[in-house]
A protein has these predicted regions:
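Membrane-cytosol interface motif
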Residues: 84-88, 139-158, 306-329, 351
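N-terminal hydrophobic signal-anchor/signal peptide
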Residues: 1-23, 27, 74-76, 125-287, ...
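Signature of alpha-helical transmembrane segments in polytopic membrane proteins
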Residues: 1-138, 274, 462
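A hydrophobic, helix-centered structural microdomain
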Residues: 269-332, 369, 446-462
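A short, structured surface patch at a secondary-structure boundary
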Residues: 342-405, 447-455
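Membrane-spanning helices that line or support transport/gating and their immediate boundary helices
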Residues: 33, 128, 132-136, 158, ...
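C-terminal terminal-structure detector
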Residues: 386, 393-462
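Short, glycine-rich, amphipathic interfacial segments at transmembrane boundaries or analogous
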Residues: 179-181, 238-242, 247-251, 309-348, ...
């Protein structure tokens, strides 16, 4: 894994994206050389480089939006072909819309077909080569765990079930004396002469410390320091979860980690960058989704007025504001007078509302809240004060998520299902804490792309 602007990214996925970007850029030049190889004709695009860059970026965006950089690195030819076809179809639709606005980007019909054919072929070949390389043991992270308790069990499960381009190999666990074991016996390793000697023996690339009580006399402080000085990376469980799951886990969190763990950028430059991103992204989304907003008039036909729904939510620093949404539930949804979480197949949701929720159309009016500065485009979802007071009482550090503005979309929304319980709130909080700690323009852009994938797939709606 590599860290870009505080966010962990799979090294293999990053390399694949760069290779495919270069290949797509080259495909336009190759297609042009082949098309005009007889010396006749001319290139219709006024700027070959700008047109090629536009083509490459749109295709990369389309593949990202359909999850092409998130899935298993061991896909075969058939699966690769199946997944690439809709990506290029989406790219074709987006390019057609761009060309309608900027005709000078048009390559010409014949050469465009050739560019798409060369580009798609190049992507397939690139992926097959990279997928094959990803199976090499040389590219695996070899993990040695110190501790064999419940925390070690959770870390090992995460490492073992990790999919995508980042592969891990669990060497085993070295439990401390007197520690209760929660890991399989097959993974238990006896302590050798020293941790450093064992790390070198098993060729460990990293040692993960999963010991909850670090004040114990059995905690091997000197040996861990020896490993760090010997060139073996040593991290704790909190850092491991943050890197591998994009979560700050509550079960491994210590207050000192939030205070001294870095991140939490609230500088003027970050605030100005985020505000600019909010205005630009919200403006573009508003323009692109005007037809969808007009379609929400179907609410009137099914259930009458009002079309819009205003509700008090908790914003930054606990301030209350009124969020604006398209109404997706019956007008008497809370006739009992008590706020209630939406449930699976909630009968209060109207037929039109169910479609709007699936496509996230009901969230679009919140652009008004973004323009007013009450919300950001990306951030933790704002909750109702009734639920916030309950969750702050039941969940430690829940109030930390209110350190930044809430968002229309967020890391928890693209990584986790729709939440409707305290347990779900804890899971989502772990993603929210990660975002609050590591938020950046780069992470906002990644979440924006992932949001497109969520909308297209209809995941997480109720």
């Amino acid at each position: 894994m590599i860290r870009i602007f505080n966010h962990y990214v799979s090294k293999m996925a990053f390399i694949l994206l760069l290779l495919e970007l270069l290949m797509l850029l080259a495909s336009a030049s190759v297609a042009s050389a082949l098309w005009f190889s007889d010396g006749h004709g001319h290139f219709r695009a006024d700027n070959l480089y700008l047109s090629s860059l536009t083509f490459a970026l749109v295709i990369i965006f389309s593949m990202s939006a359909l999850g092409m950089y998130q899935h298993s690195s061991r896909e075969g030819l058939r699966t690769t072909l199946i997944r690439i076809m809709p990506s290029f179809a989406l790219g074709f639709a987006l390019l057609s819309a761009l060309i309608a606005v900027r005709p000078d980007l048009y390559f010409g019909r014949g050469i465009s077909i050739l560019i798409f054919a060369i580009g798609a072929t190049g992507v397939v070949i690139t992926r097959l080569v990279v997928f094959k390389s990803a199976e090499s043991a040389l590219l695996e992270a070899r993990l040695l765990f110190v501790g064999g308790g419940a925390l070690a069990h959770e870390c090992i499960e995460l490492a073992s079930n990790k999919y995508g381009f980042h592969q891990s190999h669990v060497i085993g666990c070295i439990p401390l004396p007197g520690e209760e074991y929660c890991v399989p016996d097959a993974l238990l390793l006896p302590m050798g002469e020293s941790l450093l000697a064992m790390a070198r023996k098993y060729e460990a690339s990293e040692i993960v410390v999963t010991v909850a009580n670090r004040r114990s006399a059995a905690f091997p402080v000197r040996q861990l320091l020896e490993c760090a000085l010997g060139g073996v990376r040593v991290i704790d469980a909190a850092t491991f979860f943050e890197r591998e799951a994009c979560q700050i886990r509550m079960d491994s969190l210590q207050p000192s980690y939030l205070i001294f763990g870095g991140g939490f950028d609230q500088s003027f430059i970050r605030a100005a960058t985020k505000r600019t991103f909010d205005l630009v992204a919200s403006g573009l989304i508003t323009l692109l989704t005007v037809p969808a907003m007009l379609a929400a008039a179907a609410i009137l036909l099914e259930d009458g007025a009002p079309v819009f729904y205003r509700q008090e939510r908790v914003g930054r620093d606990g301030r209350i504001f009124k969020v604006l949404k398209f109404r997706s539930m019956r007008k008497d949804a809370e006739r009992a007078g008590t706020p209630t979480w939406a449930s699976q197949n909630d009968p209060r949701i109207t037929r039109v509302g169910r479609i709007m929720r699936k496509l996230r159309i009901d969230e679009l009016p919140q652009m008004v809240n973004v323009f007013k500065g009450e919300m950001s485009f990306v951030g933790p979802r704002p909750e109702r004060d009734f639920f916030v007071r309950q969750l702050e009482r039941d969940i430690p550090y829940y109030g930390v998520r209110h350190g930044i503005k809430p968002g229309i979309t967020g890391l928890a929304q693209v990584r986790y299902k729709y939440g409707a319980s305290v347990e779900d709130a804890i899971e989502k909080l772990q993603y929210d804490l990660y975002y609050v700690k590591n938020n950046s323009l780069f992470l906002d852009l990644l979440i924006l792309v992932d949001t497109v994938q969520v909308v297209l797939s209809g995941k997480g709606s109720r």
